[in-house]
Curated annotation (Swiss-Prot):
It comes from the Bacteria. Its cofactor is Fe(2+); L-ascorbate. Gene3D superfamilies: q2cbj1_9rhob like domain, Rabenosyn, Rab binding domain. It comes from Shigella flexneri. This is PKHD-type hydroxylase YbiX. GO terms for biological process: DNA damage response; intracellular iron ion homeostasis.
Amino acid sequence: MMYHIPGVLSPQDVAHFREQLEQAEWVDGRVTTGAQGAQVKNNQQVDTRSALYAALQNEVLNAVNQHALFFAAALPRTLSTPLFNRYQNNETYGFHVDGAVRSHPQNGWMRTDLSATLFLSDPQSYDGGELVVNDTFGQHRVKLPAGDLVLYPSSSLHCVTPVTRGVRVASFMWIQSMIRDDKKRAMLFELDKNIQSLKSRYGENEEILSLLNLYHNLLREWSEI
């Protein structure tokens, strides 16, 4: 399943990131991809050796970790170190699949269950640059407001279409979920959303408590910690 997570960054946060990224050192984006991806990848990424990068990636992690909807949808166990990319002048990233595992500075290795793109450019400021994701439900074309994030299964073929005008800047990362199976994770998310909706309408009651108990028992049964 694909999920739109709005408002991960405020407009003020987005402006801060854009200002900081204007000062960043950008390198060939192929430095962080494997042989297959390098054949179709043509973009730029912030140099991960810089102090500016270290500060900005930490700010992204803080933002997503504090966002309740992101947590409910992803049920994250491990987040990769966020990266930053930039597309301009017809740069693109052809169809590819993300690697199943990635190295992690604290955990050694992590499994990539979900991929996330956090948009940092106003969609009206550039042409093209759509994230295109192919999954079992068809093809999805994504171009979100700055500050919004999209989550999708890392097993999906996806690409970024050429940016023919302006500049598209984003942060991206991978998530190892506590729930490995996409279908089980989706069921838990739907159950959680409905519990929260019922609580907002009716307050706490025995039926809602029973559903909450069901949610946590399923999470306990299915989670890998």
